[in-house]
Amino acid sequence: MTVIIFLSVLLGTIILGVPVAFALLICGIALMLHLDFFNAQILAQQLVSGADSFSLMAIPFFILAGEIMNEGGLSKRIIDLPMKLVGHKRGGLGFVAILSAMIMASLSGSAVADTAAVAAMLLPMMKTTGYPIHRSAGLIGTAGIIAPIIPPSIPFIVFGVASGVSITKLFLAGIFPGVIMGCCLAILWRWQAKRLNLMTFSKATKQDLCFSFKNSVWALMLPVIIIGGFRSGIFTPTEAGVVATFYALIVSLFIYHELPLKHLPKVLLAAAKTTAVVMFLVASANVTGYLITVAELPTMLTILLEPLIENPTILLLVIMLAVFVIGMVMDLTPTVLILTPVLMPLVEEAGIDPVYFGVLFILNTSIGLITPPVGNVLNVITGVSKLPFDQAAKGIMPYLGMMIMLLLTFIFIPELILMPLQWIQ
């Protein structure tokens, strides 16, 4: 009965158009009433404690760093360098999109922000040079979901806080899978580009290449500083967010001179709005998570799936199928916040490495961002490309299929995630 009430209230409020954060709060109140211990004080305490975490402080700083990079010219220069490197090849703009998305993923950690930036700069160019727009939009959207995997990843921070898993280990574990995702996308795009008569650009001269590299080197130093810093223990992921913001601000103001001081309040306001949405979502999910634990839903799930605990691979397949279905109708962050406290006891009892599970979980929920009917990234590329939704969805299907195959590969070959993590550590 508890499960039915939980799902009915949650899905019912979302279908009615209630924002997810408020839907989670209403769901928490409904569970309290069902369990017959409604207490406004506990509700307020859980709401406040949900956002009261040192690790969560990384989120507003990385969001602010991303806003500064977009306004301060760093994103533009990051795209210019891959253009000079591979823009002359057949289907070169596709390779530029993949490389740009991977580099920007290592700066902001947001799939929606990265996709919007790359799509706004490259899709018009791809359209005018004869690229099939639905395939181009699909490629850029899929490249955008590399952002939650390559550090610094906001979803990894959310999962780490919700599960108690080391955020630093999650960051390090995401590097190699993120690179594999980019390489697989490039291979698929190359195969598609060979079948299309796409316009090529003239090859950049060495002088142009050197100038582009020199112009973008300050932007490219940011991921090196961030990853190198928490890898060597100089600062935590939270402190890395502060460093990223400060560095992006200095470069934008005093080196590239593209962020006037009068525009800074607008940048701060945009970052504050995004942060408020994310943090209220986290706080509301903490209320629901607390009541899920009180209602012993994780214990019920463990009992239900107990026969599969002896076979972790089958258990992972069942969990990932459920997460994939939920990810089709729910955004990444609420999916992580709702399911993590339910699934982690089961994962731990089955002896599955929590860092490995975290990477699979975030990859799966990221795939949900490009999966119809709700995918946020799919909606972004639909808006930027001005394609009908069904055409954008059609264009993304080959890449979506490839990402699902990659997820299955990681499930059956966990060493692809665990061994590189051991090497990096």
Swiss-Prot record:
Question: Where does it localize?
Answer: Cell inner membrane
- Transmembrane domains' residue ranges: 3-23, 24-44, 54-74, 93-113, 139-159, 169-189, 217-237, 241-261, 275-295, 312-332, 334-354, 355-375, 399-419
| GO MF assignments | carbohydrate transmembrane transporter activity
- Provide the alphabetized UniProt keywords: Cell inner membrane, Cell membrane, Membrane, Transmembrane, Transmembrane helix, Transport
> Source organism's superkingdom?
Bacteria
Membrane topology type, per the record? Multi-pass membrane protein
Q: What coarse category fits the chief subcellular location reported for this protein?
A: membrane
What family is reported?
A: Belongs to the TRAP transporter large permease family.
Q: What is this protein called?
A: Putative TRAP transporter large permease protein HI_1029
Q: Which organism is it from?
A: Haemophilus influenzae (strain ATCC 51907 / DSM 11121 / KW20 / Rd)
